[in-house]
Amino acid sequence: MCGRCCRDLRVPLGLSEALDWLRDGGEVQLLCEAIPWLVEPAADDLAAAYKFRRSFAALSGTLPLRVVVTVVAAFEGPCPHLQPDLACGIYERRPRVCRIYPAEINPFIELRPAGKACPPDAWSDRHPVLEASNRYMEPSLVAGIDAFRDADVGDVGAKLVLCAVLGVSSTALANEGFVAVLVEREAMMRAIGTAIDRAEAIEGNACAESWTVVSNRRRSREALASVDARAVAPEALPAQQKYLGFHASSDD
């Protein structure tokens, strides 16, 4: 047993997995990031197509965005399901991301052992080959990754509804950070259930309006304002929302 990768995490979940996590007493957060989407990318731009499929359209002022909402199980210290013997207490129904670790969900992120919490022995030659020529070798692993990606895309409409139900309309810029949405457990459970129920009524080209982009960098806010987007500093976020920045605050 190891358990090194089961601590201090935000684990991406599908919406159905999030409901299970909440029913078990865990905490679920939303992480919101946005990509300015001024023009449609070329048909052969596979990275852009991947971002498009897992996001919904929105406007900040007159600036078109694609908003990516990641639903995560959040915990500090050991996972609430990590047992004293380091076994998983929900092993048979653990989230998909736990099942595929240390593989990457994003097809455009390279697997780097140095960036994983696995002990060095996990990468030794005595274990089956995990990856070769940028392809994962184990069929069940590939199936798990595909299942997560399918759920991620399938949940997009419900995530748009979920943000509306929770009154969420703030997002960070992609590559700058996230706006984390921190809602009490029962309220989050009700909101996700409502979002799933209403998702079928959402049209594929639905656009969420009046979003605000949050940045802790003045230059980013000024650049956004110059293209008629609504941009604010993290201090303007409402209660139950928190800015998680990748960079130090900057006023220059």
Predicted features along the sequence, with ranges:
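Short loop/turn segments that flank or connect secondary-structure elements
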Residues: 1-252
